[in-house]
UniProtKB/Swiss-Prot annotation:
Signal sequence coordinates: 1-19
Record gene name: ppdis-H1
Record keywords: Amphibian defense peptide, Antimicrobial, Cleavage on pair of basic residues, Secreted, Signal
Expression (tissue specificity): Expressed by the skin glands.
Pfam families recorded: FSAP_sig_propep
The protein's name in its UniProt record: Distinctin-like peptide
Family recorded in the similarity comment: Belongs to the frog skin active peptide (FSAP) family.
The protein's role, per its UniProt record: Has antimicrobial activity.
Length: 77
């Protein structure tokens, strides 16, 4: 009777352990997916900010270029 009780208990616990292991693996995968999604969002945000900064730099350079053109044309006249 003890052997059969042990066997039944063992056979009941094996699937439980397997389910727990599978659950942990799924949680790890979800965490990795969340981390990757966050990294992508951060990268996109950084690219957008970099684009804005570059756009402002180009505007300032164009203004300086126009000022230099105006200055040179006044000097030539």
């Amino acid at each position: 009777l003890k052997k059969s009780l042990f066997l039944v208990t063992f056979l009941a616990l094996v699937p439980l352990f397997l389910c727990e292991e599978e659950k942990r693996e799924e949680e790890n995968e979800e965490r990795q997916d969340d981390d990757q999604s966050e990294e992508k969002r951060n990268l996109v945000s950084a690219l957008i900010e970099g684009r804005k900064y570059l756009k402002n730099v180009l505007k300032k350079l164009n203004r300086l270029k126009e000022k230099n053109k105006a200055k040179n044309s006044k000097e030539n006249n």
